[in-house]
Amino acid sequence: MSIVFQFFLIALVLFSLLMVIGVPVAYASPQNWDQSKPLLYVGSAIWAILVVAVAILNFLVI
């Protein structure tokens, strides 16, 4: 169970770093807003799912 928790935690950290770089770039380019809007919504949903998964796994591991 600890390995699964560590995998999800690393995925959350790396995805958060990706979002920190990607979201401002997507907002700064108005010509691609229609293309990047669904990608931002999907990325935000994945990030929220990872946060909930890490919280649940943290409860189970500790």
UniProtKB/Swiss-Prot annotation:
Gene3D superfamilies: Photosystem II PsbZ, reaction centre. The chain crosses the membrane at residues 8-28, 41-61. GO terms for cellular component: photosystem II reaction center; plasma membrane-derived thylakoid membrane. This is Photosystem II reaction center protein Z. Belongs to the PsbZ family. Keywords: Membrane, Photosynthesis, Photosystem II, Reaction center, Thylakoid, Transmembrane, Transmembrane helix. It is a multi-pass membrane protein. The keyword Repeat does not apply. GO terms for biological process: photosynthesis; photosystem II stabilization. Pfam families: Ycf9. May control the interaction of photosystem II (PSII) cores with the light-harvesting antenna, regulates electron flow through the 2 photosystem reaction centers. PSII is a light-driven water plastoquinone oxidoreductase, using light energy to abstract electrons from H(2)O, generating a proton gradient subsequently used for ATP formation. It comes from the Bacteria. The lineage of its organism: Bacteria, Bacillati, Cyanobacteriota, Cyanophyceae, Oscillatoriophycideae. PSII is composed of 1 copy each of membrane proteins PsbA, PsbB, PsbC, PsbD, PsbE, PsbF, PsbH, PsbI, PsbJ, PsbK, PsbL, PsbM, PsbT, PsbX, PsbY, PsbZ, Psb30/Ycf12, peripheral proteins PsbO, CyanoQ (PsbQ), PsbU, PsbV and a large number of cofactors. It forms dimeric complexes. It is found in: Cellular thylakoid membrane. It comes from Microcystis aeruginosa (strain NIES-843 / IAM M-2473).
